[in-house]
UniProtKB/Swiss-Prot annotation:
CDD domains: LPLAT_MGAT-like. Its EC number is 2.3.1.20, 2.3.1.22. Keywords: Acyltransferase, Cytoplasm, Endoplasmic reticulum, Glycerol metabolism, Lipid biosynthesis, Lipid metabolism, Membrane, Transferase, Transmembrane, Transmembrane helix. This is 2-acylglycerol O-acyltransferase 2. Highly expressed in liver, small intestine, colon, stomach and kidney.
Amino acid sequence: MVEFAPLFMPWERRLQTLAVLQFVFSFLALAEICTVGFIALLFTRFWLLTVLYAAWWYLDRDKPRQGGRHIQAIRCWTIWKYMKDYFPISLVKTAELDPSRNYIAGFHPHGVLAVGAFANLCTESTGFSSIFPGIRPHLMMLTLWFRAPFFRDYIMSAGLVTSEKESAAHILNRKGGGNLLGIIVGGAQEALDARPGSFTLLLRNRKGFVRLALTHGAPLVPIFSFGENDLFDQIPNSSGSWLRYIQNRLQKIMGISLPLFHGRGVFQYSFGLIPYRRPITTVVGKPIEVQKTLHPSEEEVNQLHQRYIKELCNLFEAHKLKFNIPADQHLEFC
């Protein structure tokens, strides 16, 4: 039975839905449309635009791995405020961040579309710059997406950078500090476990971000986004199932995961690709001090990794009851 939305709704709520629809469209289809449009322009009287952009693209080819190109006006678009209010999304600070230092922030969980990570670190809708004055956030994204013309410039303007060591080093070595490099540690593969009530994190063997922190002496900041996994339902794909096998194979081949998810639609609540209206609260933990070690041993990496997991668990346990998570529910790692 399809549950339709009321015919008469406040314009505020309609604008919120439109803002989220724009985000989902951008996440799922904008890169592909930009690529097709770029090629199609070659066969029109506007072919010169493609040539000029290609020249610009070549000259600017290293920018995504050199800190990107923050454009504050785009980060402050009103549409992001409507998107934030749709769920709503809020950002909680538990400790200060020193603006004279550079940080690595581990963001958990990925969720299906990484809504919390984008809203908090790539827009000013939740007031990141006011909550953490002097800190400029960046968020790592698969290098693949920066190969899409026009789309690359759009995502760079929000603070997204490539997920390469060179990209991380450029940000973490900036003199004067004031940079936070966000890494969604579980990555695209973790999206396959994103469903309501799931607290499984892909972290047990993810140690690259820890090695980065040791190499650059950057404090580690654990971040947990409560409600991230509640935004969509997902077709059952338990470990060992044929669907999960296919998804894992495609993820290894293409570098992106393909969760079969569904939420609600624009005019009805029963099915569609728009996330449910469920609150997201992103809690930023206290920094973990890291001693700079240019060539860390496996033991040093493992020790810091275990400490990070412990601090992340402490952060989750300290706040879970506020979000009606059962007392006997704990984070699970794979």
